[in-house]
Amino acid sequence: TGVPVDLPKTHAPRMEMEQEKLLLTITKEQKVYLGETEVPYDRLEAALTTNTRLQTERELYLQADETVPYGFVAKIMALVRKGGIEKLGLVTDPTGSE
């Protein structure tokens, strides 16, 4: 669920994402969403550190549109780590043929 994006395609077998875990989404416009809520880039670290659920679970899934530059995704991942998240799962589309 969450904000719709075109995920990168992979040949990896499908792994089930835990439905109750929070999802961080990066759209092709490089907008960032925590769950269904848009979070400005300059407020992301604060949003992560003040989210009680994330600070308890310390786990988050990241999905990014396949057109988002790698450097931008890397910056978001660094902010996630600074925000105290210890486990970050990357969501892809396992049906890819590339």
Language-model segments: what does each one mean?
Residues 1-98:
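Long, low-hydrophobicity, acidic/polar, solvent-exposed interaction domains
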